């Protein structure tokens, strides 16, 4: 007994859906591969180091998305120095994999001073931190400051910091500073050019924090 026309129609629909699904996966993989090649090329042009994976680096920090989803693993990591007028700063950019999936691109740049407390600067669209060690302090430009020590951080929240934080852009909902690092999370699809701009913006945030700290020491 042959299959009915309805059955053949259902089979055809399933085949089409499977084909579309495979095409989507293939394009997604190609896009990911292109992004990795782009980052490799970027690292090579600047003499930076590229690593496929680093399971240890993210555990260096504890606030921001590190607290939210755990240290996870650094994928497609590039590391090197960002030249600035007052000296070069160590920097990292990597795909942040948490619980088996990449949740964001994390960029980090080293500061020349050590902060006595942590500060997270979140856009209004970002979720409120669930870290009990942080408390809301005040607005900083377009962002809200959540800090681990209000007395230590308040003098650092200058107009220059507000301008630097606002310049980071609306695609970066969360940036934070802890110890001698300034970090930010960017969307997974961020281009190499955008990440280069982000590192420059984070350098300005780091300088603003340094100046605020030096003015009160």
Where are these regions (language model features)?
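Membrane-cytosol interface segments
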Residues: 15-16, 30, 55-65
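Core hydrophobic alpha-helical transmembrane segments of single-pass membrane proteins
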Residues: 12-20
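Feature marks short, highly hydrophobic, charge-poor N-terminal signal-anchor/signal peptide-like helices
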Residues: 1-13
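Charged, low-complexity intrinsically disordered regions
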Residues: 40, 44-46, 52, 58, ...
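Transmembrane-cytosolic junction motif
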Residues: 20-45
């Amino acid at each position: 007994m042959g299959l009915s026309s309805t059955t053949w129609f259902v089979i055809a629909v399933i085949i089409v859906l499977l084909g579309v699904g495979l095409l989507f996966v293939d394009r997604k993989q190609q896009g990911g591969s292109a992004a990795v090649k782009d980052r490799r090329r970027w690292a090579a042009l600047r003499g930076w180091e590229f690593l496929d994976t680093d399971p240890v680096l993210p555990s260096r920090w504890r606030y921001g998305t590190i607290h939210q989803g755990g240290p996870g693993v650094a994928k497609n990591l590039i590391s090197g120095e960002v030249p600035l007028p007052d000296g070069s700063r160590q920097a990292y950019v990597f795909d942040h994999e948490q619980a088996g999936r990449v949740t964001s691109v994390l960029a980090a740049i080293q500061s020349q001073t050590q902060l006595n407390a942590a500060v997270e600067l979140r856009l209004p669209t970002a979720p409120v931190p669930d870290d009990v060690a942080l408390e809301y302090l005040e607005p900083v430009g377009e962002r809200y400051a959540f800090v681990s020590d209000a007395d230590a951080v308040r003098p650092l929240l200058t107009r220059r910091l507000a301008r630097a934080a606002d310049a980071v852009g609306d695609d970066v909902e969360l940036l934070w500073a802890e110890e001698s690092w300034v970090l930010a999370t960017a969307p997974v699809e961020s281009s190499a050019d955008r990440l280069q701009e982000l590192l420059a913006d984070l350098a300005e945030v780091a300088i603003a924090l340094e100046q605020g700290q030096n003015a009160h020491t």
